[in-house]
């Protein structure tokens, strides 16, 4: 058995596209609902409808659950950043031209 050598006539395209997500995707839209019964109601939409033209999740939350939901989005953003670094580390560690001799 030898090493696998692909045919010289068949070269499937291998896209080198970094795994990135638009940071605006993790923003959200909060609107205070003017309800007489409970003035602490908020409508939160993730991602914002004016940025993302697709599926938008909106829910009505009170103030305590609103902070929990925003904290959940913050943790989700950290997880996606770590996943991006694991899948495509060169996107985060490449040297920018002109900064080769720069040190802290």
Swiss-Prot record:
Q: How does it sit in the membrane?
A: Single-pass membrane protein
| Keywords assigned by UniProt, alphabetized | Membrane, Transmembrane, Transmembrane helix
**Where is this protein primarily located?**
membrane
Membrane spanning stretches: 63-83
Gene null: resulting phenotype:
Displays increased levels of spontaneous RAD52 foci in proliferating diploid cells.
Superkingdom of the source species = Eukaryota
The Gene Ontology CC terms held by the record are: membrane
| Keyword Membrane on entry | yes
Compartment(s) of residence = Membrane
What's this chain's function?
May be involved in a pathway contributing to genomic integrity.
Q: Please identify the protein, giving its name as recorded.
A: Increased recombination centers protein 13
Q: Which source organism does the UniProt entry give?
A: Saccharomyces cerevisiae (strain ATCC 204508 / S288c) (Baker's yeast)
Gene transcribed to yield this protein: IRC13
């Amino acid at each position: 058995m030898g090493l696998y050598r692909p045919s010289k006539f068949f070269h499937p395209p291998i896209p080198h596209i970094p795994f990135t997500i638009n940071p605006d995707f993790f923003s959200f839209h909060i609107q205070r609902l003017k309800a007489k019964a409970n003035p602490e109601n908020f409508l939160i939409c993730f991602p914002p409808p004016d940025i993302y033209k697709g599926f938008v999740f909106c829910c009505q939350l009170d103030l305590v659950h609103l902070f929990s939901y925003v904290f959940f989005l913050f943790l989700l953003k950290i997880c996606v950043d770590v996943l991006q670094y694991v899948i495509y580390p060169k996107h985060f560690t490449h040297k920018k031209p002109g900064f080769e001799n720069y040190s802290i």
